[in-house]
Regions:
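Short C-terminal tail/terminal secondary-structure segment
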Residues: 92, 143, 220, 231-244
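Short, small/polar-rich loop/turn modules that mediate ligand/substrate recognition or access, typified
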Residues: 170, 175, 230-232
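Active-site helix of classical SDR
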Residues: 118, 154, 162
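Residue(s) in the substrate-gating loop at a strand-loop-helix junction
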Residues: 138
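Substrate-binding pocket helix/loop in short-chain dehydrogenase/reductase
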Residues: 92-95, 99-107, 189, 200
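Alpha-helical segment proximal to the catalytic Tyr-Lys
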Residues: 123, 167-171
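Canonical Rossmann dinucleotide-binding motif of NAD(H)/NADP(H)-dependent dehydrogenases/reductases
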Residues: 2-30
């Protein structure tokens, strides 16, 4: 994977940061996107290769297009896109008490952000007849978590998008997949109510959270050249929770 170019959204922390570190260790050139890049600037020494850092709001379609145009011009290609930016929104709230504003805010980041990046990366990949796109879904998108309507529905939409795009570009050399983790311990989950986190963890047969390293290891395989005959698929990383 040396000399490949990867865009990673939500790269300043959590899943995105772990994935970026692992890809960097494999010699991948990184274009890291986040709305708050101060943490990336502070931790730039963690990467084996010097990343290009872009401050961008992925809910802003114009800004996303401009950023991807800059990345394509700077590197001359884009081989990998990992959409790891995501928010949970307000949780531990039943559907009748969930605000419309919360639903829209979560969908804007989790679904529309992933749609915008893939929309503008795919035309860069097509002439090269190669690309790896990975949308970060969630087990909540497959099974639904009570009290998390916005998050669960947005991740279900992300999984559906991977299925559609996988079929649409199956003959182009571009693969589009998703991954559906159960609880991976990150700062995002530290902000959840204890009851909500326990509800999620209790459903995992291994009775533990996944680790960022476990996630990064699987992601690096999914976006590698070795993973060449799987597209439109949602990979499981749930400690045995997934039933399909």
């Amino acid at each position: 994977m040396q000399h490949q170019v990867a865009i990673i959204t939500g790269a300043a922390s959590g899943l995105g940061f772990a994935i970026a570190k692992q890809l960097s260790a494999l010699g991948v050139q990184l274009a890291l996107l986040d709305i708050n890049t101060s943490a990336l600037q502070e931790n730039i020494a963690a990467f084996g290769t010097t990343p290009a850092i872009f401050e961008v709001d992925i809910t802003n379609e114009v800004a996303v297009k401009q950023t991807i145009d800059m990345i394509a011009a700077q590197f001359g290609k884009i081989d990998i896109l990992v959409n790891s930016a995501g928010i949970t929104g307000i949780t531990n709230t039943k559907s009748d008490a969930t605000s419309t504003e919360n639903i829209r805010a979560v969908f804007d980041v989790n679904f529309m952000g992933s749609y915008f990046t893939s929309k503008y990366v795919i035309p860069v990949m097509l002439p090269k007849k190669y690309g790896r796109i990975l949308h970060i879904g969630s087990i909540a998108g497959k099974e639904g978590n009570a009290g998390m309507l916005a998050y669960s529905a947005s991740k279900a939409a992300v999984i559906a998008m991977a299925k559609v795009q996988g079929k649409e570009y199956a003959e182009t050399g571009i693969t589009v997949n998703a991954i559906a983790p159960a609880v991976i311990r990150t700062a995002m989950h530290d902000t959840m109510p204890v009851e909500q986190l326990n509800y999620m963890t209790d459903k995992i047969p291994m009775k533990r959270c996944g680790t960022l390293q476990e996630l990064a290891n699987m992601v690096c395989f999914i976006v590698s050249p070795q993973n060449s005959f799987t597209t439109g698929f949602t990979f499981d990383l749930s400690g045995g929770r997934a039933t399909y």
